[in-house]
């Protein structure tokens, strides 16, 4: 039916919002030190446990999860490009095995001090900037500008470079485990 376009515009936004929600639910894993990797729709009890906590005779929580998740996640992530927004503490819970065909892009954030010109890692802005990147990537997938199943590294880096405040994006060569460090320079 013909209309003024106002309702159609609203419907389009609603469809985009639903598409974004679907992508968020399907593509996002959150790492919990207590429960391991969980989906956003998983119901879990409120808790406080750090991955660095050491359990008597067993090592750190992160090392316990690392052993438990190594094979499972390596199989599940096989053939995929993973944008890893975890902090170092949670990053220790899973790393791809050597020879894995999963490509893991570990996202870091650095800021240049205008007075000295020196770069430093900024944990204060890292979580915020990683959140902006997650939102931008999910919108790109929901909008059809980025493939979810076989994401192209160059396209992911372009999305990162387009974030407000990002002045430069750097990537290291892949290591033997299929990991590369991507640094967003603010």
Label each region the model flagged.
Residues 4, 12-186:
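Internal, well-folded beta-alpha domain core
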């Amino acid at each position: 039916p013909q209309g003024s376009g106002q309702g159609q515009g609203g419907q389009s936004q609603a469809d985009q919002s639903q598409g974004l929600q679907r992508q968020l639910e399907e593509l996002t894993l959150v790492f919990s030190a207590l429960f391991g990797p969980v989906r956003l729709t998983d119901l879990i009890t409120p808790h406080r446990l750090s991955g660095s906590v050491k359990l008597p005779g067993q090592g750190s929580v992160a090392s316990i999860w690392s052993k438990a998740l190594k094979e499972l996640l390596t199989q599940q992530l096989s053939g995929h490009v993973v944008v890893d927004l975890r902090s170092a503490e949670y990053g220790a819970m899973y790393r791809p095995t050597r020879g894995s065909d999963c490509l893991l892009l570990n996202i870091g954030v650095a800021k240049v001090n205008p007075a000295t010109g020196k770069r430093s890692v900024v944990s204060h802005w890292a979580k915020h900037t990683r959140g902006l990147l997650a939102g931008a990537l999910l919108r790109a997938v929901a909008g059809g500008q980025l493939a979810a199943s076989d994401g192209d590294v160059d396209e992911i880096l372009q999305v990162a470079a387009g974030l407000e405040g990002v002045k430069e994006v750097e990537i290291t060569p892949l290591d033997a485990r299929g990991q590369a460090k991507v640094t967003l320079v603010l």
